[in-house]
Amino acid sequence: FVEAESRKIGSLHVPDVLLETMRKSPCIKIEASIEARVEFLISDYDYFIQDPQHLISTIDYLKDLHSKETLARWKLLAQEGHWPTLVSELLEQHYDALYRRSQNSNYVNYESATSYNTADLSAKGIDILAKQILMGHHHA
């Protein structure tokens, strides 16, 4: 199993042959509740919370995709430390739509992929989910 990725991961480039193979391969979808995703991301991206000014400047990169009002709201949420609200809005209003569009256009088997749902993205929850996926994949 590999995670769906774009051609670039940070400053690294995924080799074309690997990317092409990934995009033609069978897919699975992991659907996590918004609450679980928010909690996971706040924990995983703690460095943004520790440096709100950096996050605020990063929000400016979205200026071609969202209104000035939306960006101002997100910056205010970051400035005031309203992390669950900010992360939830970024997921629902920005990331999710772009991600779905990218997956649908790049991964030929995405639409027909088996979905696995979870509301627990703790280490234990991810371990349980991984075991479910392996069992489901083994019996497929």
What role is predicted for each listed range?
Residues 1-24, 29-31:
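Glycine-rich phosphate-binding loop used to anchor ATP phosphates in small-molecule kinases
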Residues 20-140:
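Conserved NTP phosphate-binding and transfer environment spanning the P-loop NTPase/kinase superfamily
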